[in-house]
A protein has these predicted regions:
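Generic N-terminal amphipathic, Lys/Arg-enriched alpha-helix
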Residues: 1-23
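N-terminal and secondary-structure boundary signal
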Residues: 21-24, 39-46
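Short, well-structured alpha-helical segments
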Residues: 27-38
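Active-site cofactor/substrate anionic-group-binding motifs, chiefly glycine-
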Residues: 49-102
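Residues forming anionic-ligand binding surfaces in small-molecule and nucleic-acid pockets
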Residues: 74-84, 95-111, 208-231
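A generic, well-ordered mixed alpha/beta core segment in the N-terminal half of proteins
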Residues: 82-170
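Phosphate/diphosphate-binding glycine-rich loops and adjacent basic-rich segments that engage nucleotide
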Residues: 148-222
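Internal helical hairpin/lid segments
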Residues: 225-249
Length: 249
């Protein structure tokens, strides 16, 4: 039985900030990274919140995430830009990209900025809401490692590839943020930590059969051994699996 302990936002903010400072990020960088993570937790998206700390730390130790990476704008027009991320922290690159997009949109009416050679950037919706707070329509999408098993497939071929949209509206802003898979890898990590079986219809084992074994699915994803997470819509075109597969493409 999982045991839960409650901590205040202030406690978690300090803990995460101290951790990322230990990782080598400066104060301003820590503020951005931690805000993205804790915003996710406040929204109830625990899969993309501070539970990612361990995975980020491992990424830094392995050199997959470059703490001192300096992003470079390698292409730019009045309405668009491409940023070379140099394998930096995803949250910092996502924040920089949306900041540039907002600036361009305010001048030209539209701003489109893409990032290459980045890392996991947290919830896509955070960046869409950055634009919404400025009175603009914001969109944010990203690819990821292969975790989605295409309709009728056995092996993960596509990422969770989320789509997020935020726009000003009355009485409340419109906000949508969803992966194109049934769930994300992060959700499987949460179930694994809680030692809970996965609900039916979430994942496939390496033989293409439905499974509730979170540790096994995660291990297969890492090893690229087959299996993975189902597309939005599940396993069959009858339930709309082809739609999640198509959105992911």
């Amino acid at each position: 039985m999982a045991k839960y302990i409650n901590y205040s936002y202030e406690q978690l903010n300090k803990f995460c900030t101290d951790a990322f400072k230990k990782f080598g990020f400066n104060d301003e960088q820590c503020k951005i990274i931690v805000d993205v993570l804790l915003t996710s937790d406040l929204y109830g998206i625990e899969s993309h919140g501070m539970q990612r700390l361990v995975r980020y730390h491992k990424g830094i130790e392995k050199g997959l995430i470059k703490v001192g990476a300096e992003p470079e704008v390698v292409f730019e027009t009045p309405i668009s830009a491409v940023i070379e991320g140099n394998e930096g922290m995803g949250q910092l690159l996502g924040h920089k990209a949306m900041t540039m997009a907002i600036e361009k949109a305010k001048v030209s009416g539209v701003g489109i900025v893409s990032v290459r050679n980045s890392n996991h950037y947290g919830i896509a919706g955070y960046y869409a809401k950055m634009a919404c707070k400025e009175g603009l329509i914001g969109m944010s999408t990203t690819n990821s490692e292969a975790i989605m098993v295409p309709t009728f497939g056995k092996k993960a071929m596509l990422g969770s590839n989320p789509i997020a949209v935020a726009m000003p509206a009355e009485p409340y802003d419109f906000f949508f943020d969803a992966s194109t898979t049934v769930v994300t890898r992060g959700k499987l990590e949460v179930y694994n930590k809680l030692q809970k079986p996965l609900p039916e219809g979430w994942a496939l084992d390496k033989n293409g059969h439905g499974t509730s074994d979170a540790p096994d699915v995660l291990a297969n994803i890492v090893a690229k051994a087959g299996g993975g997470i189902m597309p939005l819509g599940g396993a069959s075109e009858v339930s709309g699996s082809h739609k999640g597969y198509g959105y992911g493409m």
